[in-house]
């Protein structure tokens, strides 16, 4: 009889660990029974067996009865090989989870038809979050355990084994007790993490406990020792039933079924938002796959699409504001960086802060363990390098263009009628600058005519070696006739290149090569403004759109059809849907003064930036009647411009002094004011000559043009909106964890990256790899390169990677099952004990790290512990349900019964179920205000909870081992 005597002051934990160690030591001294017919590691015996049976893949290591030294060597080889296989499974599971992340991120486009007939296109996620967590996510994290159970049964002539089922139960115990204990402890003191979707947690926790209760029922109550076909199939069919129940809880269908639901387009990423309310008079229709469907059709969108509740809409709005804030801060902090680089920096910060899926944390944990680096930092650094390299490539393309391009510096030129000549600049860019380039030019009439408005000009411009810019001039003819603005064209043509030029500068026709062409623009438009009229004043267009982030907007007021004299034109802003006074814009009013020959002035208005993602408000800018302010005394009389004037020093008009009319804003010295009156006009009528002069003067008076009132539409910032939209598209974790090509996968496989999980660095810059990173990389580089052959997640929307990865996991799991069984029989451990302790621990290590990272980084506890319960239920329904259904059907077809010994498994299941009730009860109690959440809390509460959960796991291992070796009676 095994006895344990320890001093009374030794802790309970130490007692348990010592007892387990003595138990395993005692096992080695038990005399092994001879190999039974069913195999070497017989489960019905109370002792382990040193006689190994042939595995599914691995043969028996002969001889069967080695010496003690050989036994230690064999056990070491099996153990190291098993650990190495666990590393391989972790890495291929990384690829598997990447494919799942890509698959569950797929979106579908739908069209919403509004009551007014307008349609809006938007996208929704195809996979419901809860459904994906219970199906693909759970399958991804538990694939080794599930496949081990199936492979063990199918590989041993459809007979029941201990390794697969015990691994599932042992893994469930490790997940429920050790992983949750770690998550509770790693949250910083004073902080808490709550489960957000508590309804889903209740459902999955209930199903998890029911799953193991059901195992006990079919093993010990319904048909003791026999698994019938209906029991196996029902176990499997509990899986979709569990998924449906969790989905119903997530969608709140059982209660909300009686509340009318309306759907509207959310402002964020085009998500569809569901909320309760009264039934509207008009129907909103939704079009899916080309068909328009009424939005209130019963259960239309439930389940087929992901409908986000109003809370999600609010979260999305906050996310947009947060993106805008991050972009502005980064722009101020890094003013020298390109916009693409700023987007990548913002992308890293947003990805670091957003809630992530279980798949992401699993991938992150595996890559940190194997020296593949922090996935977010690596992605940010890669994208930043791509942005810089693309910018450099574009610059190189321009600078290293082998073809010489010749073009005008600008496509439009303006000049006054009295300017004499207008200068046009021709640019040469690219190609070999040591060559000589020739280009012809020629003027062409538009509304202006050669000979009367401008001088016809043609010729050839020669760019000598090294020259990149030339200037040509065209003469402008002035007259005293009032005319509309006119234009003419100048064309470039016939570009040719020569490497040799004669002494006279003439092209040597024997050395012409076609390595030059015309660039854009190759035609220039020259507009001639008449200077014989005071001008017509107008805005460029009746409506203009401005971004709210413009700050100070500038609006041009054009002076066309003349530019003679000084003219004042008043302006003011008028409210529309946009409000002045600093709410949407600053009220502005004043006067513009056009000097003689000045043809354009600008009005400045300050626009207030509200940082709104969507905006459409209007106000108006209006110009008033223009006033001629400088004229001769005679012209003032002709135009009836009477009143006070001041003499303008140094100005003459046709030999006569020029006077400036006094306005309210002027404050001249009273003694300088001259009064011009029409007293002489009252005495005698105007002569015909004076009448003609008055008519001409009236024709030259400044007037308003077509657009005197400009409508200004303030919209959201185009650059800001496009940047945020681009950032939103980039903040898709599927883009981070997915791969696009085999080349990318192989580069990633042979690259060592820093494994520090430090997400506080806002720039996401990669650090140098540590010694541990290099060691883990070289230990796992074989697996990394091997699994780089798996199809990238880009193919078939992730399904190609999904299928190949699960096949590879199945193959490695078969090896793990054989290695674990051979390791156990080599040292005399039963399969059930080996599975509960070693295999369950090995398959759960990546999940442990993933949950630890999720607990510290996520805002909620769902990603760290919320999926543990669902995963445990899925393990039973898929792992045991599929395996036992296949075996039961096989034996039933042969007229036999599928026998399963209820002893060890039933005892472990019962023990786990009791402890699971305690675990869930403690977690729910921790939601009370004094602690505040399932994870974290005050240090004392954390230590007590974590210690309790670890103690439950040790007790589970201890009692399961005692029962397996018949030290206590099971079922």
From Swiss-Prot:
Gene3D superfamilies, sorted: 2.60.40.2030, NCX, central ion-binding region (1.20.1420.30)
Binding-site residues, Ca(2+) 3: 417, 479, 481, 483, 530, 532
SUPFAM superfamilies: CalX-like
Residue sites binding Ca(2+) 5 per the record: 548, 610, 612, 716
Binding-site residues for Ca(2+) 2, renumbered to this chain: 417, 478-479, 531-532
Tissues where this protein is expressed: Detected in heart, brain cortex and hippocampus (at protein level). Cardiac sarcolemma or brain, and spleen. Expressed in all regions of the kidney, highest levels of expression in the distal convoluted tubule. Expressed throughout the CNS, in decreasing order of abundance in hippocampus, cortex, cerebellum, hypothalamus, midbrain and striatum. Expressed in numerous regions of the brain including multiple cortical layers, hippocampus, septal nuclei, thalamic nuclei, cerebellum, hypothalamus, olfactory bulb and brainstem.
Region described as Putative calmodulin-binding region: 251-270
Side Cytoplasmic, residues: 93-133, 189-201, 250-798, 844-872, 926-942
Annotated residues for binding of Ca(2+) 6: 584, 610-612
GO biological process: calcium ion export; calcium ion homeostasis; calcium ion import; calcium ion import across plasma membrane; calcium ion transmembrane transport; calcium ion transport; calcium ion transport into cytosol; cardiac muscle cell development
GO cellular component, as recorded: axon; axon terminus; basolateral plasma membrane; cell periphery; cell projection; dendrite; dendritic shaft; dendritic spine
InterPro entries: CaCA, CalX-like_sf, Calx_beta, DnaJ_domain, Na_Ca_Ex, Na_Ca_Ex_C-exten, NaCa_exhngr1, NaCa_Exmemb
Reaction it catalyzes: Ca(2+)(in) + 3 Na(+)(out) = Ca(2+)(out) + 3 Na(+)(in)
Binding site for Ca(2+) 4: 453, 479, 483, 486
PTM annotation (Phosphoserine): residues: 282, 389
Keywords on record: Antiport, Calcium, Calcium transport, Calmodulin-binding, Cell membrane, Cell projection, Glycoprotein, Ion transport, Membrane, Metal-binding, Phosphoprotein, Repeat, Signal, Sodium, Sodium transport, Transmembrane, Transmembrane helix, Transport
Sugar-modified residues: 41, 157
SMART domains: Calx_beta
Segment forming the signal sequence: 1-32
Membrane-traversing stretches: 72-92, 134-154, 168-188, 202-222, 229-249, 799-819, 823-843, 873-893, 905-925, 943-963
Membrane topology label: Multi-pass membrane protein
Purpose of the protein: Mediates the exchange of one Ca(2+) ion against three to four Na(+) ions across the cell membrane, and thereby contributes to the regulation of cytoplasmic Ca(2+) levels and Ca(2+)-dependent cellular processes. Contributes to Ca(2+) transport during excitation-contraction coupling in muscle. In a first phase, voltage-gated channels mediate the rapid increase of cytoplasmic Ca(2+) levels due to release of Ca(2+) stores from the endoplasmic reticulum. SLC8A1 mediates the export of Ca(2+) from the cell during the next phase, so that cytoplasmic Ca(2+) levels rapidly return to baseline.
PANTHER family xrefs: SODIUM/CALCIUM EXCHANGER, SODIUM_CALCIUM EXCHANGER 1
Similarity section: Belongs to the Ca(2+):cation antiporter (CaCA) (TC 2.A.19) family. SLC8 subfamily.
Domain notes: The cytoplasmic Calx-beta domains bind the regulatory Ca(2+). The first Calx-beta domain can bind up to four Ca(2+) ions. The second domain can bind another two Ca(2+) ions that are essential for calcium-regulated ion exchange.
Record protein name field: Sodium/calcium exchanger 1
Taxonomic source organism: Rattus norvegicus (Rat)
Gene name of the record: Slc8a1
């Amino acid at each position: 009889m095994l006895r344990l005597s320890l001093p009374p002051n030794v802790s309970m934990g130490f007692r348990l660990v010592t007892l387990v160690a003595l138990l395993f030591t005692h096992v080695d001294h038990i005399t092994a029974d001879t190999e039974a017919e069913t195999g070497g590691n017989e489960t019905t015996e109370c002792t382990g067996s040193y006689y190994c049976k042939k595995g599914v893949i691995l043969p028996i290591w002969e001889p069967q009865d080695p010496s003690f030294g050989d036994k230690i060597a064999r056990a070491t080889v099996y153990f190291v090989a098993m650990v190495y296989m666990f590393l391989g499974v972790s890495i291929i599971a990384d690829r598997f989870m990447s494919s799942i992340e890509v698959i569950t991120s797929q979106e579908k486009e739908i069209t919403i038809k509004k009551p007014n007939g307008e349609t809006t296109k938007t996208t929704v996620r195809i996979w419901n979050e809860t459904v994906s967590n219970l199906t693909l996510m759970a399958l991804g994290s538990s694939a080794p355990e599930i496949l081990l159970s199936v492979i063990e049964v199918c590989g041993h002539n459809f007979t029941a084994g201990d390794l697969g089922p015990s691994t599932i139960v042992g893994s469930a115990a490790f997940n429920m007790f050790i992983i949750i204990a770690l998550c509770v402890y790693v949250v910083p003191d004073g902080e808490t993490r709550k489960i957000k979707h508590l309804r889903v947690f209740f459902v999955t926790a209930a199903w998890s406990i029911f799953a193991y209760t059901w195992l006990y029922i079919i093993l010990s109550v319904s048909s003791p020792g026999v698994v019938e076909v209906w029991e196996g199939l029902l176990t499997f069919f509990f899986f979709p039933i569990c998924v449906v129940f969790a989905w119903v809880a997530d969608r709140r269908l059982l209660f909300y079924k009686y509340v009318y639901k309306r759907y509207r387009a959310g402002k964020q990423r085009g998500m569809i938002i569901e909320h309760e309310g009264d039934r509207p008079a008009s129907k909103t229709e939704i079009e899916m796959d080309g068909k328009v469907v009424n939005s209130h059709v019963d259960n239309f969108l439930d389940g087929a699409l992901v409908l986000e509740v109003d809370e999600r809409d609010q979260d999305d709005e906050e996310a947009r504001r947060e993106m805008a804030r991050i972009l502005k801060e980064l722009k101020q902090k890094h003013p020298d960086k390109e916009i693409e680089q700023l987007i990548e920096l913002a992308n890293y910060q947003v990805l670091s802060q957003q809630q992530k899926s279980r798949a992401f944390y699993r991938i992150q944990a595996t890559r940190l363990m194997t020296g593949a680096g922090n996935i977010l930092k690596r992605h940010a650094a890669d994208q930043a390098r791509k942005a810089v390299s693309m910018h450099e490539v574009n610059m190189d393309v321009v600078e290293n263009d082998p073809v010489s391009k010749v073009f005008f510096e600008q496509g439009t030129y303006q000049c006054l009628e009295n300017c004499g000549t207008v200068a046009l600049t021709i640019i040469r860019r690219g190609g070999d600058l040591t060559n000589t380039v020739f280009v012809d030019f020629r003027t062409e009439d538009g509304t202006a005519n050669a000979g009367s408005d401008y001088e016809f000009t043609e010729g050839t411009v020669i760019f000598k070696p090294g020259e990149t810019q030339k200037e040509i001039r065209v003469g402008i003819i002035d007259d005293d006739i009032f005319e509309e603005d006119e234009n003419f064209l100048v064309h470039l043509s016939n570009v040719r290149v020569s490497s040799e030029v004669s002494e006279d500068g003439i092209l040597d026709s024997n050395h012409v090569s076609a390595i030059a062409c015309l660039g854009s623009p190759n035609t220039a438009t020259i507009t001639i403004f008449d200077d014989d009229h005071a001008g017509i004043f107008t805005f460029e267009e009746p409506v203009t759109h401005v971004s709210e982030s413009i700050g100070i907007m500038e609006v041009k007021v054009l002076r066309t059809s003349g530019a003679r004299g000084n003219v004042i034109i008043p302006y003011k802003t008028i409210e529309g849907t946009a409000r002045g006074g600093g709410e949407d814009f600053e009220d502005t009013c004043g006067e513009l003064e056009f000097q003689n020959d000045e043809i354009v002035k600008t009005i400045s208005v300050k626009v207030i930036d509200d940082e709104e993602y969507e905006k459409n408000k209007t106000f108006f800018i209006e110009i008033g009647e223009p006033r001629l302010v400088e004229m001769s005394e005679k012209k003032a009389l002709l135009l009836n411009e009477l009143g006070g004037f001041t003499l303008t020093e140094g100005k003459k008009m046709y030999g006569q002094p020029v006077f400036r009319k006094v306005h309210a804003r002027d404050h001249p010295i009273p003694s300088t004011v001259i009064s011009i009156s029409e007293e002489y006009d009252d005495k005698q009528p105007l002569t015909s000559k004076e009448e003609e002069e008055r008519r001409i003067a009236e024709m030259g008076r400044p007037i308003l043009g077509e657009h005197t009132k400009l409508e200004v539409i303030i919209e959201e910032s185009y650059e800001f909106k496009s940047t945020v939209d681009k950032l939103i598209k980039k903040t898709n974790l599927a883009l981070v964890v997915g791969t696009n090509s085999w080349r990318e996968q192989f580069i990633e496989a042979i690259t060592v990256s820093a494994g520090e999980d430090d997400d506080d660095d806002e720039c996401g810059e990669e650090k140098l790899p540590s010694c541990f990173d290099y060691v883990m990389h070289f230990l796992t580089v074989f697996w990394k390169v091997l699994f780089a052959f798996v199809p990238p997640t880009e193919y078939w929307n992730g399904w190609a990677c999904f299928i190949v990865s699960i096949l590879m996991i199945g193959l490695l799991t078969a090896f793990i099952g054989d290695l674990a069984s051979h390791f156990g029989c080599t040292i005399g451990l039963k399969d059930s004990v080996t599975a509960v302790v070693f295999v369950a621990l090995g398959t759960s290590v990546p999940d442990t790290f993933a949950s630890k990272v999720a607990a510290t980084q996520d805002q909620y506890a769902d990603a760290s512990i919320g999926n543990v319960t669902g995963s445990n239920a899925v393990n039973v329904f898929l792992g045991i349900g599929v395996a036992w259904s296949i075996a039961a059907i096989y034996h039933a077809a042969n007229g036999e019964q599928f026998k399963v010994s209820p002893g060890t498994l039933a005892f472990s299941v019962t023990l786990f179920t009791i402890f699971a009730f305690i675990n869930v009860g403690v977690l729910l109690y921790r939601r009370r205000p004094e602690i505040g959440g399932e994870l974290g809390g005050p240090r004392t509460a954390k230590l007590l909870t974590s210690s309790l959960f670890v103690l439950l796991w040790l007790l589970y291992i201890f009692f399961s081992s005692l029962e397996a070796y018949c030290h206590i009676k099971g079922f």
